[in-house]
């Protein structure tokens, strides 16, 4: 067996070994406590800003605050929610996520990461801390394995794979649903065809079904933002 074949066979296995860390659970618990407290005192779920401030305090107090994101790797890209850094030394991708796709509180964000790791266990997210992005916004720092890819997946390949997983296109393919979870942004730039022939869903938006995910996505995605004149 040559080296290339070994790489192809081992990439998927190595990705599966990545497990979500306890930091995500800790951060989720802190955010949940803030939400419960605000709901009790004010009868509202609108507490996103308070949750982010509390998480920043927690990260700074526990040596989890990364002062300079450039220490993670080389700046690679800026998407709608993630600022991406690449470390070729560690074969990792680091994403500073600014919580854009959480509406009035952060709990859907933590649920989404857990769901992603359940559905797409070959390229899971692991939380390693928090940092400010280039816009000065506090972000959670997530890492994923660097995927050796031949190319972006095609829309047809993405649809075929999601159908295989039990998801069906809704609203003329605007998103995919299995009745439990709704997947948005499963577009070619967010799904890679690995050198092992496997599709890797590296960056999708997921909401629980029947929780208003479509309206939330449309209200927060730059794809639907009013154009400035």
Predicted features, each with a name:
Residues 93-100, 145-147, 203-205:
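Active-site ExK catalytic segment of metal-dependent nucleases
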Residues 98, 117-173:
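Conserved structural core of kinase catalytic domains
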Residues 92, 140-142, 182, 200:
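Protein kinase-like catalytic core scaffold
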Residues 86-87, 146, 193:
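Conserved hydrophobic "DFG−1" position in protein kinase catalytic cores
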Residues 1-72:
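Juxta-kinase regulatory segment immediately upstream of eukaryotic protein kinase catalytic domains
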Residues 45-48, 69-122:
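ATP-binding glycine-rich loop module of kinase domains
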Residues 101-111, 152-157, 210-213:
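Active-site-adjacent loop/helix micro-motif of nuclease/hydrolase catalytic cores
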Residues 176-229:
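Catalytic activation segment of kinase domains across protein kinase-like and atypical kinase folds
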């Amino acid at each position: 067996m040559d080296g290339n074949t070994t790489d192809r066979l081992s990439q998927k296995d190595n990705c599966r070994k990545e497990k979500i860390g306890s930091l995500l659970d800790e951060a989720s618990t802190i955010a949940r406590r803030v939400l419960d407290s605000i709901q009790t005192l004010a009868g509202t779920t609108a507490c996103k800003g308070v949750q982010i401030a509390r998480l920043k305090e927690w990260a700074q107090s526990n040596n989890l605050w990364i002062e300079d994101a450039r220490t993670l790797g080389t700046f690679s890209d800026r998407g709608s929610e993630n600022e991406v850094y690449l470390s070729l030394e560690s074969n990792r991708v680091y994403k500073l996520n600014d919580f854009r796709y959480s509406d009035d509180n952060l709990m859907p964000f933590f649920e989404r990461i857990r769901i992603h790791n359940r559905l797409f266990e070959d390229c899971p997210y692991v939380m390693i801390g928090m940092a400010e992005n280039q816009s000065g916004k506090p972000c959670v720092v997530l890492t994923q394995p660097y995927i050796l890819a031949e190319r972006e997946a095609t829309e047809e390949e993405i649809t075929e794979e999601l159908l295989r997983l039990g998801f069906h296109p809704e609203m003329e393919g605007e998103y995919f649903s299995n009745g439990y979870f709704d997947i948005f942004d499963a577009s070619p730039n967010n799904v890679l065809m690995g050198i092992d022939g496997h599709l890797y869903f590296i960056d999708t938006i997921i909401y629980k079904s029947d929780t208003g995910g479509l309206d939330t996505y449309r209200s927060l995605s730059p794809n639907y933002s009013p154009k400035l004149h």
